């Protein structure tokens, strides 16, 4: 997948609404906007501009356009967000024009993928974007926010740094063990290894907890017939989800 071309996609949910946002990212983004608006004025970064959109010389819509100049954008590339009226017809026409002027349709998640490749996110932050979008509870939301802030990524970076440091010490021991060079006491090496194992264990436990927060947990309610399993389920949900009867 090339990151040298320009991509376009609808950023807001599809369907009819008051507004829709079409996003462009890539080197041709400013030129495509100039063709859409029939203007040659240079776009001002991070300034909302009210401009008309044209198709075949006729007015298509009026829109608010914001230009984010590379590398100070979500993807790290030249990026443009076009806020137009949320008519499916207008959105489709606008995207077709962007394709005609040199863009291609973005693949699912490609904007975030480009942000990752351009160093705007680490991998845990990139995954956290999707986790945040699909979060359904306060706990899953907070976990996604924590990852998006880079907390998990910093812990992985710390683990990597300590492993590299340990490897360096061990290689030094192997290469210069026969020379009169002060070496690290075995107790210090053991302490470093224990520290690495503790960090690794913590990350493994956080993965298990995070998986439950993201995907939920399957909890069976088990018991003999007519022992109140359905009533217990309804009590947990605070609604009559399962059919119950007072008669055995």
Residue ranges of each PLM-predicted region?
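Alpha-helical structural signal
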Residues: 29, 91, 113, 160-163, ...
């Amino acid at each position: 997948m090339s990151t040298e071309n320009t991509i376009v996609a609808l950023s807001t949910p599809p369907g009819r609404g008051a507004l829709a946002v079409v996003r462009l990212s890539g080197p041709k983004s400013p030129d495509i906007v100039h063709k859409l608006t029939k203007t040659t004025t240079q776009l001002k970064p991070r300034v909302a501009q009210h401009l008309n959109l044209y198709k075949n010389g006729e007015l298509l819509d009026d829109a608010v356009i914001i230009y984010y100049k590379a590398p100070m954008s979500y993807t790290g590339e030249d990026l443009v967000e076009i806020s137009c009226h949320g008519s499916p017809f207008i959105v489709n026409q606008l995207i077709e024009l962007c394709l005609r002027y040199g863009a291609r349709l973005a693949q699912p998640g490609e904007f975030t993928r480009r942000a990752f490749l351009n160093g705007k996110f680490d991998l845990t932050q990139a995954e956290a974007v999707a986790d945040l979008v699909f979060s359904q509870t306060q706990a899953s939301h907070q976990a996604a926010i924590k990852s998006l802030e880079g907390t998990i990524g910093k812990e992985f970076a710390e683990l990597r740094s300590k492993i590299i440091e340990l490897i360096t010490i061990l290689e030094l021991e192997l290469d210069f063990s026969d020379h009169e060079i002060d070496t690290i006491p075995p107790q210090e090496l053991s302490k470093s290894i224990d520290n690495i194992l503790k960090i690794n264990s913590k990350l493994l436990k956080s993965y298990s907890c995070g998986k439950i927060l993201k995907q939920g947990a399957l909890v069976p309610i088990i018991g003999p017939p007519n022992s109140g399993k359905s009533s217990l389920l309804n009590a947990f949900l605070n609604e009559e989800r399962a059919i119950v009867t007072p008669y055995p």
